């Protein structure tokens, strides 16, 4: 049995962190198993627990994807959503070892709230632009291409060109001011009108 002095020395050693007893602990060297390689045993200077390690700087050491997903990333388990990979422009600097910060670069931040008013404005602009081209006043073609009005204004219309507004194609051209009769256009009067 160990004496009282040995017991005191052992307690002092435990407090100082150098436990030499055969009790299993994280820092004590392990005895190699029979048949194992002699260098496979753990070295006597084992690493301190994780809490004693210096804090990892997020600027210099990049966490792997699995660690980023486990650390509460907003894209964990969601493929195709979240922020696209980019160089980190627009991120905040400083504040040491903090958790994943929000990306201030809205060029890549797809999870940001979409500005729906912008798309509503775009839709209105597109609809107005389309209406400007399609909703044309119905009289524009008829007035400009009507042979009757052109004959009255002294501008005889070219019969060889397609008449968009009317099917009236006069065979004879008359100077402005003269009456335009249906006979000149090649129309035949109704028999009732002939009898009158």
UniProtKB/Swiss-Prot annotation:
Disulphide connectivity of cysteines: none
Polar residues composition bias: residue spans: 19-28
Outcome of mutating residue 129 to Y: In a colorectal cancer sample; somatic mutation
Biased composition (Basic and acidic residues): 86-95
Region named Disordered: 1-55, 70-99, 153-196
Composition bias, Low complexity: 34-50
Signal peptide bounds: none
Protein name stated in the entry: Putative uncharacterized protein MGC39545
Organism for this UniProt entry: Homo sapiens
């Amino acid at each position: 049995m160990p004496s009282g002095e040995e017991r005191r020395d052992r307690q002092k050693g435990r407090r100082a962190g150098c436990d030499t007893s055969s009790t299993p602990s994280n820092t004590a060297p392990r005895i190699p198993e029979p048949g194992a390689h002699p260098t496979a045993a753990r070295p006597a200077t084992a690493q301190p627990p994780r809490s004693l390690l210096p804090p990892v700087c997020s600027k210099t050491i990049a966490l792997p994807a699995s660690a980023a997903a486990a650390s509460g990333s907003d894209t964990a388990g969601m493929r195709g959503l979240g922020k696209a990979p980019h160089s980190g422009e627009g991120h905040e600097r400083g504040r040491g070892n903090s958790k994943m910060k929000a990306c201030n670069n809205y060029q890549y931040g797809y999870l940001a709230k979409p500005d729906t008013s912008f798309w509503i404005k775009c839709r209105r602009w597109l609809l107005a632009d389309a209406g400007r081209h399609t909703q044309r006043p119905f009289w524009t073609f008829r007035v400009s291409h009507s042979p009757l009005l052109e004959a009255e204004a002294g501008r005889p219309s070219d019969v060889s060109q397609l008449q968009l507004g009317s099917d009236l194609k006069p065979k004879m051209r008359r100077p402005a001011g003269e009456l335009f009769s249906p006979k000149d256009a090649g129309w035949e009067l109704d028999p009732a009108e002939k009898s009158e």
